[in-house]
Swiss-Prot record:
GO terms for cellular component: adherens junction; cell leading edge; centriolar satellite; ciliary basal body; cytoplasm; nucleus; protein-containing complex. This is Afadin- and alpha-actinin-binding protein. Transmembrane segments: none annotated. Residues 361-381, 507-527, 565-595 are annotated as: Disordered. The gene is Ssx2ip.
Length: 613
C-alpha cells in the first residue's frame, strides 16, 4: 500500500481549532496558544487541502482509498462503508449513509478525546502548581524549623546560665542574711557590755566624789583635839610664833591658795590629757573610716607580708616595754604615755590584720569564689598567745596605776592637812564647785551635740550607701546581660535587652558608677556607715580594748577568723545595723561552738548608748 498519511478535512481542522480554543484557552499558557495559532494559520486553507488530497487520494486510487478506509474502520469496530449485496457476484456499492455515520462517530470521538486531553492537561497544570507550592512551603518550613532549633538551643543555654546565676545569688543572699544576724547579735552583746562598763564607771566616779567631799567639805570636829606635852624647842633656840587668829587666818589663806593652785594645775593636766586622748581617738576614727571606706586598693601580697612582720615586731616591742617590774616604779605621766603608745600600736595591729583579711576576701570575690585563703594554724596560735600576754600585761599595768593613785591620795592627806581641810568649808568653795559643775554641763552639752552630728552624718552615709547598692545591682544585672555569648540579630538583641532592663537604647546599658569615696564596692561591699559606730564606741583604755581580744585564743587551733566589711542600713535615729562579713574557716576537727564564742568575744568592745552622761 505504501506510506499513507492521515487525511485532514479543512472543516474538521477549523472545528478542532475552535474547540481547542474554547476548551483550553483559559488553561493553557499563552506561548502554547500562540504556537497553535501560528501552526493553524501558517498556510492558506486551499493550498493545505490541495496538498493533503494530492498526497492521499487521487483520481486514480479512489477505490483503493475507500477500501483502505473501510478496512481501517471495520478494524476499529465501525460498520462497513459498503452496502451488503444480496448476491456474491454483484459489485458492492458505497453507502453514503454509513460513510456519514462513521464520520459523525469519528468527530464525536475526536471531540471526546480533545475534551479528555484538555481536562488531563488542566489537571496536570493544577498538580504542577500544587507541587511547586508544596515544595516552596516545605523549604520555608524546613528553614523555620532550623531557625527554631537554633533559637531553642540558645535559649536553653541562656536559661541554664540564668539558673546558675540565680543559684549563686540565692547563696549570696543567704550568706548575707546570716552575716546580718551575726552582726546584730554582736551589736547587742557590745551594747550590754558597754552598759555594764558605764555603770561600773559611774560607781567609781560616785565613790571618788564622796571621798573628795569627805576630804574637802567636812568641818573639823573641835571636840576632838590633841595637845603636845614636853614641847621640844627649835635648834636655833628661837621661840615659835604664837598661834593667834591672825596667824591661823593667814595660814588658811595660804592653804587655800595652795589648794587652788593645785586644783588649777590638775585641771590643766586633765585638759591636756583629754585633748591628747581626743586626738588619739580622732586618729583611730579616721583610720577606721579609711580602713572600712569603699576605696579599697588591690590586695598586695608583699604589703601583707610586710604588715605581718610589723605586727609581730609591734607586739614584741609592747611586750618588752610593758614589763612587770618596770610598771611599779613609773609615774602617772609615764604610765599614761605608755598607755597611749600601746593603744596606738594595738590599733595598728588591728588595722593591719583587718586589711589583710579584707584583701583576702576581695581576692576571693575577684577570682570567682575560689577557695578562701586561711591563716595557718601555727601563726594563729602564736598570734593568740602574744595577744594573751599583752592583755595580761595591760591588766597588771592598770592595777599598778590604780594602786599608785590610791597611794598618792593616801599619802597626800596627813594629819596636818586633814585637820586643816576639815575647817575649810566656805562659801567660795561652793561657788567654785558650782562653776566647775556648770563647766562640766557645758562640756556635756557640747559632747551631746557632737555625738548627734556624728550620728546624722552616719545616717546620711547609710542612705548614700543604699543608693549606691541599688545602682550597683542594676550595673551588675546589665553586665550579666552583656556577658551572654550568643550572636543574635541586632533587633533580637535590642528586644532582649529591653525586656530585661526596661529600655531598648544601648546607651542606657552603660552605667557610670559614682566615685567610691562615699560608697563601697560590692559582692564584698564596704561599710562607711558602720565606721561611725565603730569609731564612736572604740575603747579608751586597754582594759576595754584588750579583753575583747582575749577569747580569740580559745579553740584557736581549729578556727580562723576572717572579717570583711559588707553593708550598713540605718534602722533608727542614732542607731545603725552594721553588716560586716565574718566568716570562719574551720578545720574538720573544730568544735561547733568555737565561732560563736570567738566572734562575740572579738567584737564585744563595740558598744552603743544613747543616754550618755
Amino acid at each position: 500500500m505504501g506510506d499513507w498519511m492521515t487525511v485532514t478535512d479543512p472543516v474538521l481542522c477549523t472545528e478542532n481549532k475552535n474547540l481547542s480554543q474554547y476548551t483550553s484557552e483559559t488553561k493553557m499558557s499563552p506561548s502554547s496558544l500562540y504556537s497553535q495559532q501560528v501552526l493553524c494559520s501558517a498556510t492558506p486553507l486551499s493550498k493545505n487541502v490541495h496538498g493533503v488530497f494530492s498526497a492521499f487520494c487521487t483520481g486514480e486510487n479512489i477505490e483503493q482509498s475507500i477500501s483502505y478506509l473501510d478496512q481501517e474502520l471495520t478494524t476499529f469496530g465501525f460498520p462497513s462503508l459498503y452496502e451488503e449485496s444480496k448476491s456474491k457476484e454483484a459489485k458492492r456499492e458505497l453507502s453514503i449513509v454509513a460513510l456519514l455515520n462513521c464520520m459523525n462517530e469519528l468527530l464525536v470521538l475526536q471531540r471526546k478525546n480533545l475534551l479528555a486531553q484538555e481536562s488531563v492537561e488542566t489537571q496536570n497544570l493544577k498538580l504542577g502548581s500544587d507541587m511547586d507550592h508544596l515544595q516552596s512551603c516545605y523549604a520555608k518550613l524546613k528553614e523555620q524549623l532550623e531557625a527554631s532549633r537554633r533559637e531553642m538551643i540558645s535559649l536553653q543555654e541562656r536559661d541554664r546560665q540564668l539558673q546558675c546565676k540565680n543559684r549563686n545569688l540565692h547563696q549570696l543572699l543567704k550568706n548575707e542574711k546570716e552575716e546580718v544576724q551575726k552582726l546584730q547579735n554582736i551589736i547587742a552583746s557590745r551594747a550590754t557590755q558597754y552598759n555594764h562598763d558605764v555603770k561600773r564607771k559611774e560607781r567609781e566616779y560616785n565613790k571618788l566624789k564622796e571621798r573628795l567631799h569627805q576630804l574637802v567639805m567636812n568641818k573639823k570636829d573641835k571636840n576632838i583635839a590633841m595637845d603636845v606635852l614636853n614641847y621640844v624647842g627649835r635648834v636655833d633656840g628661837k621661840r615659835g610664833s604664837w598661834r593667834t587668829d591672825k596667824t591661823e587666818a593667814r595660814n588658811e589663806d595660804e592653804m587655800y591658795k595652795i589648794l587652788l593652785n593645785d586644783y588649777e594645775y590638775r585641771q590643766k593636766q586633765i585638759l591636756l590629757e583629754n585633748a591628747e586622748l581626743k586626738k588619739v581617738l580622732q586618729q583611730m576614727k579616721k583610720e577606721m573610716i579609711s580602713l572600712l571606706s569603699p576605696q579599697k586598693k588591690k590586695p598586695r601580697e608583699r604589703a601583707e607580708d610586710s604588715t605581718g612582720t610589723v605586727v609581730i615586731s609591734d607586739v614584741e616591742d609592747d611586750a618588752g616595754e610593758l614589763s612587770r617590774d618596770g610598771v611599779w616604779s613609773l609615774s602617772c605621766d609615764t604610765v599614761r604615755e605608755q598607755l597611749t603608745n600601746s593603744i596606738r600600736k594595738q590599733w595598728r595591729i588591728l588595722k593591719s590584720h583587718v586589711e589583710k583579711l579584707d584583701n583576702q576576701a576581695s581576692k576571693v570575690h575577684s577570682e570567682g569564689f575560689h577557695e578562701e585563703d586561711v591563716i595557718s594554724r601555727q601563726d594563729h596560735e602564736q598570734e593568740t598567745e602574744k595577744l594573751e600576754l599583752e592583755i595580761e600585761r595591760c591588766k597588771e599595768m592598770i592595777k599598778a596605776q590604780q594602786q599608785l593613785l590610791q597611794q598618792q591620795l593616801a599619802t597626800a592627806c596627813d594629819d596636818d592637812t586633814t585637820s586643816l581641810l576639815r575647817d575649810c568649808y566656805l562659801l567660795e568653795e561652793k561657788e567654785r564647785l558650782k562653776e566647775e559643775w556648770s563647766l562640766f554641763k557645758e562640756q556635756k552639752k557640747n559632747f551631746e551635740r557632737e555625738r548627734r552630728s556624728f550620728t546624722e552624718a552616719a545616717i546620711r552615709l547609710g542612705l548614700e550607701r543604699k543608693a549606691f547598692e541599688e545602682e550597683r545591682a542594676s550595673w551588675v544585672k546589665q553586665q550579666f546581660l552583656n556577658m551572654t555569648t550568643f550572636d543574635h540579630q541586632n533587633s533580637e538583641n535590642v528586644k532582649l535587652f529591653s525586656a530585661f532592663s526596661g529600655s531598648s537604647d544601648p546607651d542606657n546599658l552603660i552605667v557610670h558608677p559614682r566615685p567610691r569615696q562615699k560608697k563601697p564596692h560590692s559582692v564584698a561591699n564596704g561599710v562607711p556607715a558602720c565606721t561611725s559606730k565603730l569609731a564612736k564606741s572604740l575603747p579608751t583604755s586597754p582594759s576595754d580594748f584588750c579583753p575583747s581580744r582575749s577569747c580569740v585564743s580559745e579553740h584557736s587551733p581549729v578556727s580562723a577568723l576572717t572579717v570583711t566589711p559588707e553593708e550598713t542600713k540605718p534602722n533608727e535615729v542614732g542607731r545603725e545595723s552594721t553588716d560586716q562579713k565574718w566568716s570562719v574557716v574551720s578545720r574538720p576537727s573544730s568544735r561547733e561552738g568555737c565561732y560563736g564564742g570567738c566572734s562575740s568575744a572579738y567584737t564585744s568592745s563595740h558598744v552603743e548608748r544613747d543616754d550618755l552622761p
